[in-house]
C-alpha cells in the first residue's frame, strides 16, 4: 500500500485502521457495538475502480460487519477529486434515510510528501446497481415487471423527497448510482456533485445522457432536474436502451433539448413508444414516466405529485401488505412514517 506516516496505522498490507487524529468525519447514526474509528478492517476484495480511485469490500475484525471503502488518491493535479469527495462527505454526513447510502466515517492517509489518500467508509450494498441489472436483463432478453419498477420508483422518490426537505439536489441520478440490497430495496449513492440549494443554479454538471434540458441550456434549474434524470433512468429500465443518443456531445445535447428519442424505443412511425414493449405496462405508468421527461421543468411532476399518483399510492399500500408491516412499524419509523402520511393524504 506504500509508505505511510504516523497519520495512519497499517497492521499489514490488507488491514487498515483509522487514526483518531486525522478523522474527517464520523457519522452520529451508528449502531455498531464499537465506534467505526476504533476498529481495524480487513480488505476482502476489490469491488470497482474509476477515475476517483478504488472501492473495496472491507470487514471489521471486531464485529465482522462488512462495509465499502472508497480510496481516492489526492495529488496537486487531482484537487477536483478532493473537492467532489469532500462534498460527498459533507452531504452524506448530514443525511439519515433508509433509501440513501450511509456514510460511516472518513479519514486521511499520508502516502508521501505530495500525495494523500482520502478514505471513506460507507454502508456496503450487496446486490449491485441498476445499470448492471439492465445489462443482465438485456442479455437475457427479459423485461422488468411493472410492480418491481413501481417499488423502485416510490423508494427513490421517498429519498428525493427527503433530499428536498434538506434542500439538496442530487444532480447525477442514473442507474449506476442506484444500488440494490438482496431484498430489492434501493440505495441512492454518489453524492459527489450534489449541492445544497440556496437559489436556482445554472452550473453545467452531471452525466450528459441523463442531464436535463435546462442544465444543458445553462438555464437556472432546481429540484425538477432530478425528476428528468429519474425519468430517463426509468425509460432505460423499461426499454433496456438509452433514451437519448448522439454521435457527439453536440448531437446528444440537441436531442435532449428537443426530446428527440432513440428511434429503437419508438414505434415505426415514431409517433409514440414501441408498442411491443409498452404493452407490458399500464398506460398510467408509461404516461407518468413520459411526463417526467417533459422538456419544460414546469410540466414535470414534483416528487410529492408522483408519490400521490393513484398508481404509486396503490403500489405502496400493496408493498406494505406484501412485506407484512404492521401499523406500529409504519408509524414508528422514519421511512414508514413517510409512506403512512402520503397514502393517507
Question: What feature does the model see in each segment?
Answer:
Residues 54:
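Conserved N-lobe ATP-binding subsite of Hanks-type protein kinase domains
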Residues 66, 71-95:
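Conserved N-lobe beta3->alphaC-helix segment of eukaryotic protein kinase catalytic domains
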Residues 226:
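Conserved catalytic-loop aspartate of Hanks-type protein kinases
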